[in-house]
């Protein structure tokens, strides 16, 4: 069983494949880019009761787009 607080499975799947957790990548990035990468990497790996898996994946990708757009808007200021 995964540790839902310290090592949730929707973030640690990458460790099983590559030996690195999502946080090991995103902690070195600014907030918007780190969150965009986080949502991209967890897309398709997080399930939530009451949500269709495809709907959850789309939601995560939309969140990533939001953070990318926010980063672009900050750079344009």
Positions of PLM-derived features:
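Intrinsically disordered, low-complexity regulatory regions
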Residues: 1-77
């Amino acid at each position: 069983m995964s540790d839902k607080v310290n090592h949730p499975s929707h973030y640690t799947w990458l460790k099983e494949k590559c030996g690195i957790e999502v946080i090991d990548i995103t902690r070195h990035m600014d907030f918007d880019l780190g969150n965009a990468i986080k949502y991209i990497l967890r897309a398709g790996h997080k399930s939530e009761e009451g949500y269709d898996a495809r709907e959850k994946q789309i939601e995560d990708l939309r969140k990533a787009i939001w953070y990318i757009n926010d980063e672009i808007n900050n750079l344009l200021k």
